[in-house]
Amino acid sequence: MTVITKIEVQKRSKERFNIYIDKGQGEEYGFSVNQSILMKHGLQKGLEIDEVALGNILYNEEVQKAYLQAISYLSYQMRTKQEIEDFLRKKEVGQAIISEVVSKLLHDRYINDKEYAISYVRTQSNVNQKGPTVIRRGLLSKGVQDLIITHSLQEYPKEKQMENALFLIEKKKKSYQKHSFLQMKLKLDEMLVRKGYSRDVIQICLEELKDEKDDEQQQEALHYHGNKYYEKYKKYDGWTFENKVKQALYRKGFSIDEIDIFLQMKREEG
């Protein structure tokens, strides 16, 4: 039988205690526990403990240690159930202890995937202007159930998606001033797909660009690229020269009519 001979507070933490024991060969350091474990098991000087009781004490101490690690991890931001499990596995915590810790965290409402998903959707839509597809993918990667994700995305109605998509279009199109209107639309389309917006939202938003088409900007872009290709292919003569310029400008999204007008203007310039 093991007897507790001394209990002393650790110097670095007043909530942890060193337990000294005697197994019949004199006093020795036995183990350390958190204050809650000390009180839960009624540990005190002179208490006799057998191997089974000692095993329970040490197991509960490991659970408490992992629980406090999880609480510390949660103190920075909300986490999902899977994120807590992954965090504890990296700390080399056993699965039985992880299950017990997660169960306690759920009971104490420190983790709640439904609340997490709603908060995540609001942040990603309002702050980062992410589309629902990217948001869903992000939540799935954090272990949130598909049904919970679908419910949480109700916080992100189509009207808000379109508002965000139009905001991104307005913000990004300024960087495509030297592109043809068609090429600008293609690049904006690609950007919105990467951001996670659905095809129908993208089409509706890009349709609004038709009314905003800037002919002056289109001409500036045509002249910018046209003059560049004029220089690039000037070593060629006649039909070969014009054909290469036409193909290059067509790939940039300019219409045949626009290209022909540009080439005619260049001929007149001499």
From Swiss-Prot:
InterPro entries recorded: RecX_HTH_1st, RecX_HTH_2nd, RecX_HTH_3rd, Regulatory_RecX, WH-like_DNA-bd_sf
Residue ranges that the Swiss-Prot or TrEMBL entry lists as coiled coil: none
Protein name as annotated: Regulatory protein RecX
Keyword Cytoplasm assigned: yes
Species per Swiss-Prot/TrEMBL record: Bacillus mycoides (strain KBAB4)
Keywords annotated in UniProt: Cytoplasm
Membership in a protein family: Belongs to the RecX family.
GO biological process: regulation of DNA repair
Major localisation: cytoplasm
